[in-house]
């Protein structure tokens, strides 16, 4: 039996911070101990946490690892490597790959592939289309994290835009629907208008006017209406506007069937950043005004935003060249998501307890993940140790994503991920990832 004692830690868990230690026995947390308490049995390995923060591993509910079919820019192994280095111990991957994850065959192939490649734990969304709503009730609810619904066209073009199909998806899903909400008719009209005025590829600064706040608010409002009509479980992804916040309830997660995610990119950048970062920060929905960013940040200290995700979506830098219509949408983010939000903690925008709630606890609760997301005896030992006082600057040579770049390059951070544990194994330490480790399928109790 393998027993590891992580001692002298500041444990952040379930709304509290306390000095203590944790005993890992094989894959699971065996004991959570107060400051001076020693383990009930001897431990073969002892790790001194040096007073650093010890928290549950981050669960990222929103990634695009580009595997299969788009592996020139990312794959499950490289991106799970970046995840481990960033303190992310579990991910849920989107269906807009090649082939798209819109059949049971494609879904099962993804799971089989991840079992041989992924360093951290994983699950996959099943993609809704205009033709597969009848398949949704047959999905294995204990294995599939959710149904992804594109109510706006984005990378991979999986748009579901027929009202009768949308109603059927909301009626048939039987599990969480994760929705990308942008009204395509508004985007199309804006695209036509801007092309007429500025040519075939308007400047990147017009991206938030083409994929506008109006498009987001309209689509999110429609999704919420359909969810209420069908008593469906709806999770709206990457909220990007101040107006959308008015659509959600400031209630505890346990009392809601309609929830919201904000992504690091929309919490960190705003439209002025297009001047320097240009297409590097182009994403869908677009990064909008400072007023939108500030409203999203303010909402982090409330229950309006339930989850912080990344929408990690790598592309090669050459694919990010061009203007608002030519540059592709998406950016790598998973390796720096935790330290980025720790900067917001440092600025007083949210507390570290709220960070852990929105990046660790809430994804586990919202998706009904079995035995993860909390530091509790009997739970899987997915943990991250964070140095709260280590200043460093992001450089290109530290990027582990296959695409080889990050919009965070040059950013100064004041905290650092020191160690990451996945299922009791130390997979990241001293700037090195254990490439031989393999994560597990997430399981869902529904």
Identify the residue ranges that each predicted region occupies:
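Short, acidic/polar
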Residues: 73-80, 130-139, 222
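Histidine/acidic residue-rich metal-binding segments in metalloenzymes
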Residues: 134-308
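Divalent metal-coordination and catalytic microenvironments
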Residues: 9, 22, 27, 51, ...
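A glycine-rich helix N-cap at a beta->alpha junction
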Residues: 112-128
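Metal-associated gating/positioning segment near the N- to mid-region
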Residues: 50-117
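Histidine-rich, glycine-flanked metal-binding segment
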Residues: 1-5, 10-56
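C-terminal cap of metal-dependent C-N hydrolases
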Residues: 9, 323, 377-443
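His/Asp/Glu-enriched, well-ordered alpha-helical/loop segment
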Residues: 201-222, 226-231, 301-308, 313-389
